[in-house]
Amino acid sequence: MALWIYVVPPLAGLVIGYFTNDIAIKMLFRPYRAYRIFGWRIPFTPGLIPQNQPRLAKQIAKTIMGSLLTPEELHNLARKLLRTERMQAGIRWLLGVALDRLQNPEQQQQTAQVLARILADLFNESLPRLVKVLARQETFLEGPINQLFDQVLLELRLNAEQARQLSEWILKQALPPKVLRQNLVDFLTDRNIEALDEEFRERATGSYWLVANLFGLKNALLRLRTYCLEEPEGAEAILEDLLKDINAPRRLTEILQNLSLQNLPVSAVRQLRRALRDGIQDYLRSQGPEVIKGLGESIDWEKVASLVLGRLRNSKALIASIDQISADLALILERYLERDLESLMMQVIPVLNLDQVIADKVNATSPAELEQAIQQIVRQELQAIVNLGGLLGFLVGCVQVLFLLR
């Protein structure tokens, strides 16, 4: 009997079984495009997969989203990605990048401009509105004002040097002889002179009563006023000598040095504190927003921002606190995500539109690239199936030999 009966069927089965997968894959993809003869499309062109690639892409996306990337799997994946250690490392990296940015003069200038705009908007827009809203409350700044009064104004007392300087300023700038003379003239009106004369006549006793009723004060006060008007320099010289004779600087210094709110009665102090608080609150209600806005417009915010960034750049405390800050922020995010991660994922999944992304990616891949990818998977991951196909083909060939020998 011829040798080919024993050899050809097993070898043919082996070859067919081994290369069937490659042939089947090529038949699914090829040809890549349609061929036409006289405008008539040849059947089975293009291949099955290129012809139905859009529908296949949607089916692949549906399968992946329905079986692999389910909301539960995405939720678990997000939990793994957003573990505290990873979030802390990410926040630490961001803070490090921000600090490195401050070391670059050009980038620091850009950051300063951004920070300046933020500070200006906060001070010129947000803060006035906040003050306007808070000022409507009856207790607005009540605590700070009371604390300021109790700890600063109530304890305020001038030392000897401060009292001396203030007394000199009062006598030389606020109340010099010229001002005293003018105030005296303004005070000695006809009406005031009449009132003083009558009061003196009514209250004088003893020898003063005789002087008051015989001579009175009216003529003396009229002459004093006339002298101050007609001889201003002489009147000022007299007032200056009078201040020296009574040692006004020393006396005023002693008065100022001994001046303290603690010497007032408790009721007077409380009333003064209440009046101060009400005055500040009323002023802030009426003029506070405009004053704050005007103050903000007069500030060079870019310079302020540069100073702040300079302090932050050289702050050892900030650099040493980066780990602690990142850990605290990570814990805050973790508590927030534990509560709202599921709802966030339900909102994020439609926004991501993963099924459409997968379908678009499949549609954007050429049939040749798809074929190459599947062939690579078969060779690397499914080689056992290829070998099994060859083995089955060989066994089928052996069975055929048995049938031929019968």
From Swiss-Prot:
Subcellular location: Cell inner membrane
Any single Gene Ontology cellular-component annotation: plasma membrane
Keyword match Membrane: yes
Chaperone in keyword set: no
Disulfide bonds listed in the record: none
Residue ranges of the TM segments: 1-21, 385-405
Membrane disposition: Multi-pass membrane protein
Keywords: Cell inner membrane, Cell membrane, Membrane, Transmembrane, Transmembrane helix
Main location: membrane
Family: Belongs to the UPF0754 family.
PANTHER family named among the record's database cross-references: UPF0754 MEMBRANE PROTEIN YHEB
Name recorded for this polypeptide: UPF0754 membrane protein CYA_0973
Gene source species: Synechococcus sp. (strain JA-3-3Ab) (Cyanobacteria bacterium Yellowstone A-Prime)
